[in-house]
Amino acid sequence: MRNRNGQQGVAMITVMMIVVVLSLLMVASLNYAMQGEPSSRRDQDWNAALAAAQAGVDDYLYRLQQDDEYVQYSATSPPTPANVAFTGWHNIPGPANSGQFHYSATDLASQGIIQVTSTGRVRGVQRTIRASMRRRGFLDYLYLTDYESLDPQSGYYSDPTTATSRCSEYWWQGRSTSYCVRISFVTGDTINGPLHTNDTISVNGNPTFNGAATTAYTGAMSCTASSSFTWRWYGLSGCSDRPVFQTGDPEVVPLLTLPTTNTAIKTETDRAAGKTGCLYNGPTRIVLNSGGTMTVTSPVTTSSAYASCVGTNVALPANGVIYVQNVPSTQTATCTGSQNRLGYPISGDVTSYGCRDGDVFLSGTLRGRLTIASENNIVIVANTTYSSTGAASTDMLGLIANQFVQVYHPVNSSGTNLSDSRNPTSTFTNPQIHAAMLALGHSFIVQNYNEGAQLGTITVNGGIAQKWRGPVGTSGGTGYLKNYGYDARLQYASPPYVMDIADTPYRVSQWAEVQNPTGLPA
């Protein structure tokens, strides 16, 4: 009996030890779980605070898209009805503790950007986003065209007025393909940047598009040749034309309507209103100097208000804006023989220039940020480049002409290239152009593109936007070959005030998390 009792005692002790061990394990597990819960909660709140900040950005963007003057409002100048996000914390709809946001906005008008700083808050955890918002516009593209048709004023059509009337239609609207000359991307063409056309992309062969391609053409055409496929481009030879879209077939996006005039930029030269831009009358020669100055000759600009804008090594305008207007009707302007007072055209050149036209003759090396707009044409007469290039460069040039942006190419009546002693290469060989260019009424074009011997390759670092397609050469060996590359900085930065002429919805172009600002509401 005593042995049996001893065995029972040992069993009891063993059971008690197991219970103790299990209890200790349960306590340890519970303690671990209790310690982990605050960490897990903090992680959730940390992520939720960033989402709340993003909700603030989305909220402001929505309001801005409904009212593009919304940037005028702030904590001290509130809208009606009031927006609590300016002065306090806006609750995100949903369960309790879904989060709150507070924001402020700054209008960086010279850069075409509205900068929104949005802070999200969840259970005391705060995180902040700074977002740049700007309109969709021509700066988003290496190549943007309204009509994929030869410019009626290119010199090809015998009756430019009739051509303008008949060719101011998109392909799907029934533009005459027998009368209007369609310009196609061909085998050997490589587009190294984003492209958009309001028209239908026209191809002949196998061009390569290395950037995203978009079109406002909403239809799709079917092909039932060796393989069945649909596409949103027009093949000159039908099914055998197969362009290479490296980022995928063209997407359909809304029509991007180009403004009809650049006069909004001219307002930045109004000295009576306190603006600091430079305004010139009639033909004006601008040479950009690598030290950050410019040399300007403008014979018909006589206003004392702009005396500091003319001469040798003058400073770039403080706000970075130059506007060249036609000579006002109240002012006299005369030619020197067949030339304007700048010596254009040179002797024997078949190109004509007006004595009263707001034409810019441009060359040089830019250090700084500058926008040059003209009431008539901008003529690039020699290399026009930045003093530094690359992602870190702050040099940026916008060229916006009401009519053409032209590359200077003088020829005589026999179609022979002419030399101009003012150009460092005499004849303008292998032009280098660093700029975002917009030809509102016409196109980016080489003068006399179908005359003279070929002069090498034209290199563009920036972007080209135009109403019609403008030729730079021909397959017969005239003009130039093309080497166009997109300046990726244009995705988030802008030459001064160029976006003033846009009339498209705002979008977020860039955002980053930043330190929480001081002075946040309690």
Task: Outline where the language-model segments fall.
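Beta-strand/loop motifs with alternating small/hydrophobic and polar/acidic residues, enriched
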Residues: R2-T197, L520-A522
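C-terminal globular interaction/adhesion domains in large, modular proteins
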Residues: N91-Q100, A105-Q115, D140-Y141, T145-V381, ...
